[in-house]
Amino acid sequence: MENEGKDNGEFSFVSDGGAETGRRGLPKIHTEKNAPTTERDICHDDSTTPMRARTLEHLHSLQKKRSTPTTPLTDSQGVFSPVSEAERQKQQLISISASLASLTRETGPKLVKGDPEKKKEAHKASVLDHLHFGEPILNLSDSALKSTHILYNPSPAELYEQAIKYEKGSFITSTGALATLSGAKTGRSPIDKRVVKDDTTEKELWWGKGSPNIEMDEHTFLINRERAVDYLNSLDKVFVNDQFLNWDPENRIKVRIVSARAYHSLFMHNMCIRPTAGELEDFGTPDFTIYHAGQFPCNRYTHYMTSSTSIDMNLDRKEMVILGTQYAGEMKKGLFSLMHYLMPMRQILSLHSGCNMGKNGDVALFFGLSGTGKTTLSTDHNRYLIGDDEHCWSDNGVSNIEGGCYAKCIDLSREKEPDIWNAIKFGTVLENVVFDEHTREVDYSEKSVTENTRAAYPIEYIPNAKIPCVGPHPKNVILLACDAFGVLPPVSKLSLPQTMYHFISGYTALVAGTEEGVKEPQATFSACFGAAFIMLHPSRYAAMLAEKMKKHGATGWLVNTGWSGGSYGSGNRIKLAYTRKIIDAIHSGALLEANYSKTRVFGLEIPDAIEGVPSHILDPINTWSDKDGYHETLLKLGGLFKKNYEGIHTYQVERDSELAEEILAAGPTL
């Protein structure tokens, strides 16, 4: 190398005996060894492949590829088979437009598939003009002149984007869950729930004293439906979920949920059964539709309305309307009420229960009200979880109604509930929780928004979930009661009439609080352990339960997870370790081999010994130092049972008065 470029400093760059210089004498640098002379005015970087995009807009369009259409259906009986992708999308939109049709104007909205914020031209098959369903009797409204954008079965990732961008109060937590707020209502509003009373439901449904069903007429329902549909059609976009209920393929129900919030769409994506792409192609017309317009109030001056909130169900039209509440649990429990009507019509028993299965195929059902340990005891690492809340029992066995879990989060900890803790990750909806503003770590002990904090996640997030969520006929039916009076045995074997009696009663006790000076436990009863959701008389569900238990040889058990040695305040809570030993003995069949004796008043059969459980606690009288106090409290609880049962025994179970009398006789004797 030779120094020839004095103006360039100490060094110059020489090629083939001479230095190449630019206009100002600076050396040119080539990264390509044999760069053509025509390109020597450009500095090349050949360390990466050339960029294919010409503009930023083009680059962003390359980031996402269009979903590949699934293989066209070959079954000629398929709703959309076999048709082009464009025609299939058009038929989907026609079905959705029919769902959103105004009954007054008899038209459906003009639909566009996709996010309205996307400026690119819509695919020609994804646009549908408003359709007339019959001759219009009024002029079109302004909403008919605009397009309603449909986000159809969006993925969790898409719903995260929608929620965070457009819904105030939506955040990603430190574990990846979506934290959101349900607005003013942080729980269900049972006093605002209405069911249309018509010629059919008047005869079939349970009305009157003790019933959760509050009537409304069809005219009022249609007013609220029109209000909800008009609100949804006025929006720039709505979310549409087409999903299933019931894992039993022979008895599954197709449901459509139309909502205004990404939060509601993701919640139902998690809670209902998620269809495959092929199942969506053949989805067709839904069996039931929910119109969730919860951000818009009902007219409280409309007949049957008592507030700005109304949750209305029309079983004849197969529709549900939600106005004035954004609490997502209304959709879940509304569909559960629907199943409590539809399934018994098919001779299938719908149940508010947990369900698990042993490795040998033995299935157990767990019934229990809040605080009885239903979730804790049905979640067993040695057994498969079929479901935590809603089930059906058909001739095929048991099946979960849902595709997800809706777990309470208050005071949640990794140590107590590791499965729920670990399920709170990307895709999970966290309702009304409080988190650190910087780290986004959730404080599950915080109750400043509500005590009813919840997590909704797919059941696949539970490691030992059984997928598909079905199982054989149950061997054991376990009724859980948290008896704060301290007089029920830790476990009792029930006869069939006793099982029906305690199933209809649905007993537990609320622990005394400090409010209003309450110092004693309070008994609470919820028929079939879910009175708020049943549609028929409790005795009809009990009769079906008895028939199935008798046919398949299931055994009934009453397990007290409450107090022993005295009532709340003087006795002690039965140790969870003892209750788990009892449940294990039920699962293994060991309790069937035990010797039994009968208690007074309730006539319950109690075992004399259980491995791992102190024998003296099995008969509650042994744990009370005040024997007179025990007998007095026992009679008091028996009286509360009898008072609760008044009126129910007059109903003829499936027109079988003898069966009704057997159930009544299985109650306490005072």
From Swiss-Prot:
Q: Which top class of enzyme applies to this chain?
A: lyase
Q: Mainly resides where?
A: cytoplasm
| Gene3D superfamilies reported for this sequence | 3.90.228.20, Phosphoenolpyruvate Carboxykinase, domain 1, Phosphoenolpyruvate Carboxykinase, domain 2
Q: Indicate yes or no for the key word Cytoplasm.
A: yes
| Entry's Gene Ontology cellular component terms | cytoplasm
Cellular localization per UniProt: Cytoplasm
* EC number assigned by the record: 4.1.1.49
Keywords associated with the record: ATP-binding, Cytoplasm, Decarboxylase, Gluconeogenesis, Lyase, Nucleotide-binding
Q: In which pathway does it act?
A: Carbohydrate biosynthesis; gluconeogenesis
Q: In which tissues or organs does this protein occur?
A: Cotyledons, leaves and roots.
One Pfam family name is: PEPCK_ATP
Q: Which reaction does it catalyse?
A: oxaloacetate + ATP = phosphoenolpyruvate + ADP + CO2
Which amino acid positions bind ATP, per UniProt?
A: G368, L369, S370, G371, T372, G373, K374, T375
List GO molecular-function terms, semicolon-separated. Answer: ATP binding; phosphoenolpyruvate carboxykinase (ATP) activity
Q: Where do the segments described as Disordered lie?
A: 1-48
What is the superkingdom listed in this entry's lineage? Eukaryota
Q: Where is the composition biased (Basic and acidic residues)?
A: 29-47
One of this protein's GO BP terms? gluconeogenesis
UniProt-listed SUPFAM superfamilies: PEP carboxykinase N-terminal domain, PEP carboxykinase-like
Protein family membership: Belongs to the phosphoenolpyruvate carboxykinase (ATP) family.
Q: What is this protein called?
A: Phosphoenolpyruvate carboxykinase (ATP)
Q: Which organism is it from?
A: Cucumis sativus (Cucumber)
Gene encoding this chain? PCK
